[in-house]
Amino acid sequence: MCVFNLIALALLLHAQLGSSFILSCYFTNWAQYRPPPTIYMPNDIDPCLCTHLLYAFATIKNNQLSTYEWNDVELYSQFNGLKNKNGNLKTLLSVGGWNFGSTGFSQMVLSPTNRQTFINSVISFLRKYEFDGLDIDWEYPANRGGSPEDKQYYSVFLEEMRAAFEKEAKQTNRARLLMSAAVSAGKDTIDSAYQIPKLGQALDMINVMTYDFHGSWDPMTGECSPLFRGPEDQGGFIYFNVDYAMNYWKSQGAPAEKLIVGFPTYGNTFTLRNPADHGVGAPIAGAGTPGKYTQEAGELAYFEICGFLKDGATEVWNQAQDVPYAYKGNQWVGYDNRKSFQIKVDWLTKSNYGGAMVWTIDMDDYLGTFCNQGKYPLINVLKKGLNLDQHNPWKQLWRQLWRKLQRGHQWHEQRVLRWKEPVLQLQQWRDLLWKMCCWAGL
């Protein structure tokens, strides 16, 4: 069979066999400041790992979308350049975040003029830097210094932005810019912040932050992202689990296929009041010791947790909530591992949710040297569980094509090699096949 037919067949089969699930991964523009060897830049991202990459964070200045870090523009170029290696990859710019708070958003959505100013700046900004969409991380409407009217005006803002994106796409004959939002998983916040059916209509993806259910702000230990309610959960804590949060969003009118389940690649840490009392719900004295690389009290990246375990920490499987925790001395961490990710992604697919969201890509063991589980061990569990790794017999076809190029075979079928004039060089075909192998999940 000629190379042209092989390529055409492989592309067709890939399109037919692809997964419909989304795997969105956040990149943080402060990971560049970590000590070596954990400095993480956009060029370090595997372009074939996730279906959507979200760049955190941009900010709002004078009701306009704006950069935050001094070198964001340079990093944008690296980030969006990843699409040259994976033509199916989508990139979104995320604006806001926990530290940005609520006031800036609240002031922007309050008036039609402010909303229009922001929306116009978004379209211009995203097109200029070649993003495919915007992710709004407002934490949270009508909370943390926001206005009670935020709930209503947030919906109006999203509807207006959706209409503006659709209008711009028609006028320019380009693909419509995508819209996603990071939203709360806490019942009280959900009730006060969101008109869920309207969000479900306007947004393409609803990224539910199903993590940080427990942390050092509580008086006792607890899991960061438990799948189910635990026996210790009483009162308002009965709502603090992934299963309840996702079902609540769905029951209030959010389309299941737009609901994206949040997966943390970190754990929340605690300092025990009594090292001998080290179960779930044990009293604490405060946040856990900062990690060597992330350097933030109360939190450890997954690759740091692997170091904690190697240093002799005891790992316990929390059967009731399908997540692990670990302790050593007066230090305690509730987190996720490959086993809990597998259980959760199986639950996700059976529940017919739209996919998984990862916070963050740079806190997984991306080097593969800390946990000895390969590169990106947690995210790869999701990729496989969502059927995004493309394990199918047609991989052999792609490998055959790649090997031919690696051996330097010269292909002379002019209808394949000629792109106008002159004949494509071998290196160009190698680059093309690299992209095709990426698309096929190789």
Where do the language-model regions lie?
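Glycan-recognition patch characteristic of GH18 chitinases/ENGases
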Residues: 16-126, 152, 158-160, 373-397
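Glycan-binding loop/region signatures in secreted carbohydrate-active enzymes
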Residues: 26, 95, 214-236, 263-347, ...
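Cleavable N-terminal signal peptides of Sec/SRP-targeted secreted and luminal proteins
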Residues: 2-20, 436
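Cleavable C-terminal sorting propeptides in eukaryotic secreted/cell-surface proteins
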Residues: 418, 422, 426-442
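A cross-domain feature marking catalytic cores of carbohydrate-active enzymes
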Residues: 27-29, 57, 93-97, 138-140, ...
